[in-house]
């Protein structure tokens, strides 16, 4: 996985013991599964996400990447992907969205911005600016 220095803070390679519990109430994981780094859907998804790192930061998104099916990570066992999968996890640790194809950052932001916890965050940010 080739990442720029700026994007390294947002993209994390899944290890065998990577656990979603580590992100509950602090970040919104987007889990990207593919059978290979060469998967065209995987490549497109990483490009889409890399286009607007600020949008990822504003929404507390961390992107967890697993392109090794033989790894049998905790995430693979829990989420059971088939080939490419885009899975959005809320800050509460629950699956909010599961897609078999890439999503652009605008679509992702729209879904997240409708979530109750995100609405509270945006309200709080507005109050702080006053």
Give, region by region, the residue ranges found by the protein language model.
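Non-catalytic interaction/Regulatory regions outside core domains
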Residues: 1-130
